UniProtKB/Swiss-Prot annotation:
<dbReference type="GO" id="GO:0042743">
    <property type="term" value="P:hydrogen peroxide metabolic process"/>
</dbReference>
<feature type="topological domain" description="Periplasmic">
    <location>
        <begin position="28"/>
        <end position="465"/>
    </location>
</feature>
<feature type="binding site" description="axial binding residue">
    <location>
        <position position="355"/>
    </location>
    <ligand>
        <name>heme c 3</name>
    </ligand>
</feature>
<feature type="binding site" description="axial binding residue">
    <location>
        <position position="125"/>
    </location>
    <ligand>
        <name>heme c 1</name>
    </ligand>
</feature>
<keyword id="KW-0349">Heme</keyword>
<keyword id="KW-0560">Oxidoreductase</keyword>
<feature type="binding site" description="covalent">
    <location>
        <position position="59"/>
    </location>
    <ligand>
        <name>heme c 1</name>
    </ligand>
</feature>
<feature type="binding site" description="axial binding residue">
    <location>
        <position position="211"/>
    </location>
    <ligand>
        <name>heme c 2</name>
    </ligand>
</feature>
<feature type="binding site" description="axial binding residue">
    <location>
        <position position="63"/>
    </location>
    <ligand>
        <name>heme c 1</name>
    </ligand>
</feature>
<feature type="binding site" description="axial binding residue">
    <location>
        <position position="429"/>
    </location>
    <ligand>
        <name>heme c 3</name>
    </ligand>
</feature>
<feature type="binding site" description="covalent">
    <location>
        <position position="207"/>
    </location>
    <ligand>
        <name>heme c 2</name>
    </ligand>
</feature>
<dbReference type="GO" id="GO:0046872">
    <property type="term" value="F:metal ion binding"/>
</dbReference>
<keyword id="KW-0812">Transmembrane</keyword>
<dbReference type="Pfam" id="PF00034">
    <property type="entry name" value="Cytochrom_C"/>
</dbReference>
<keyword id="KW-0997">Cell inner membrane</keyword>
<feature type="domain" description="Cytochrome c 1">
    <location>
        <begin position="42"/>
        <end position="155"/>
    </location>
</feature>
<dbReference type="InterPro" id="IPR051395">
    <property type="entry name" value="Cytochrome_c_Peroxidase/MauG"/>
</dbReference>
Amino acid sequence: MKMVSRITAIGLAGVAICYLGLSGYVWYHDNKRSKQADVQASAVSENNKVLGFLREKGCDYCHTPSAELPAYYYIPGAKQLMDYDIKLGYKSFNLEAVRAALLADKPVSQSDLNKIEWVMQYETMPPTRYTALHWAGKVSDEERAEILAWIAKQRAEYYASNDTAPEHRNEPVQPIPQKLPTDAQKVALGFALYHDPRLSADSTISCAHCHALNAGGVDGRKTSIGVGGAVGPINAPTVFNSVFNVEQFWDGRAATLQDQAGGPPLNPIEMASKSWDEIIAKLEKDPQLKTQFLEVYPQGFSGENITDAIAEFEKTLITPDSPFDKWLRGDENALTAQQKKGYQLFKDNKCATCHGGIILGGRSFEPLGLKKDFNFGEITAADIGRMNVTKEERDKLRQKVPGLRNVALTAPYFHRGDVPTLDGAVKLMLRYQVGKELPQEDVDDIVAFLHSLNGVYTPYMQDKQ
């Protein structure tokens, strides 16, 4: 028995020595790299402090594509575990945009701020299996508070609106502004062109055909129907509040509203016109429209001018004054108790990490299936998403995060339009993005909160402009 105990003790001592030796090497490696010169590349001391924190904690190991890894990465077993962490970490969050913004003294994106805030608040990063070896990676309460204070400062400086109540200025979301500056004459033209079916090949389909302003800015179909009954490959996103998207279309292939407006008229399975010349030839026959157009655009009809006018009109398609916006502005009675609970659950369960900002989304491109692989079945070109634009492998199956404003009015959901209810959409997100299930009562509370995002659209009245 004594011999067994002695062998066990020797074995444990050996393990401890190996662990301490490896941890000591890792500490030396981490400490050395944290002092490298590029951490000091920003001209702003506060930015340098954040950059130093990210480097010291080793965030770039898993959240950038090309970090220098420690020597123990090549040990069998450790390599497989680290490869898994790196793959999941880089898929979930790319730190490069944050570093670039800090180095250039520019605002960090809201979606990135929201993600960093969540892992700081809930103390999920760095994970325990990482800090077990990387002692320098542990985050102290003081460091956590400093990062959260930096996030609050970024929000206050770059994102918070002046009419947000003081107690809500550090929320991961902001209210929709009451109006945006626009050119009234261009808006009038854009309104007419948005509803003009002559932009389509057979003069039967207008922009409003798939983006109805009396139906949540969508057509309510799984995918849209184009000229001649052609079936589109993807669900039509709402036109309301699209001005707040970082880029347009699910895959972000259009940088601006104007770029987006130029897509459907020439798309063979949407409006199917062969060229702008074909469209202009029809518009030229309308003397009233032509006169009105020349007053605003003396050079006359062109694809650029037509889409410029439509984009200007689309800037008016915003929906402020939802119950949630009123709450953000200080009306505590604007939300029910259930909706307030739902909003807290929305934040607790990471929803706001992607669905933040003014429209609770529209600011980043994310993959479906962070915690569990999503079964797409046969993958289509539309499913490929952002990769169609960037050609980057990391962007495969990523879509622009849809905004949640008026989401109760825009079923069916997701880019395939294959989820008919909000209840189903919430449960799918929880399962595949968060990796959990919630009691039905909690799901109901989140759905109730989502209903509070229904805003007010004031229809454009052309005769009053």
